[in-house]
């Protein structure tokens, strides 16, 4: 269970082994139409804010990832840091890009910091990432985590190419349009985050 729940992604990006989310994911989530996908597939993203819509017990976490797309296939290098336990997790995700907007369902394997596989992808577990907005500096994404047929709940993340900071006005507007309040998100600048930029930039 821990390698699965270590994913967050986000893209791409899960919480931690104690994230405890439950409940169905929202069914009305759609990617932004007409979004230039190059705005999203543009280097390493850092999760600067996140909102778990149905938490039970959630450890604070930090996450970064680099998504790349080629021929309709998305691959991600994902790094996660549990700031309470001071533990790190590494994953590689892969999935197919949908035909409308930037949305993909991916499976992931667990690797070490040199990308050597520790545990292969479980075909029953996956995450669906939907890009709601993205510009040159920040993005808003929705993530639905699944363990087998069970949804683990909605997760919204605000991404930036900087490790800390506020999202752009465009992304702030997208947060509001989604019926969310940025003040309800966890701001990761308070978590003493560490990152492995060498892993995500490989």
Swiss-Prot record:
List the CDD domains hit by this protein, alphabetically.
lipocalin_NP3 (cd19454)
Where found, per UniProt?
A: Secreted
Annotated positions binding heme = 80
Q: Which UniProt keywords apply?
A: Disulfide bond, Heme, Hemostasis impairing toxin, Iron, Metal-binding, Platelet aggregation inhibiting toxin, Secreted, Signal, Toxin, Vasoactive, Vasodilator
Summary of the tissues where the protein is detected: Salivary gland (at protein level).
> One Pfam family name from the record?
Nitrophorin
The UniProt entry's GO biological process terms, in alphabetical order, are: vasodilation
Reply yes or no: does the keyword DNA-binding apply.
no
One cellular component term (GO) for this entry is: extracellular region
Q: Which residues cross the membrane?
A: none
Cystine crosslinks: 25-144, 62-193
Q: Which GO terms describe its molecular function?
A: histamine binding; metal ion binding; nitric oxide binding; toxin activity
User: Which SUPFAM superfamilies does its entry note?
Assistant: Lipocalins (SSF50814)
Instruction: Give the primary localization class.
Output: secreted
The family line of this record is: Belongs to the calycin superfamily. Nitrophorin family.
According to its UniProt entry, what is the function of this protein?
Heme-based protein that deliver nitric oxide gas (NO) to the victim while feeding, resulting in vasodilation and inhibition of platelet aggregation. Reversibly binds nitric oxide (NO). Also binds tightly to histamine, which is released by the host to induce wound healing. Exhibits weak anticoagulant activity.
How does the record describe its quaternary structure? Interacts weakly with host coagulation factor IX (F9) (inactive and activated) in the presence of Ca(2+).
What protein name applies here?
A: Nitrophorin-3
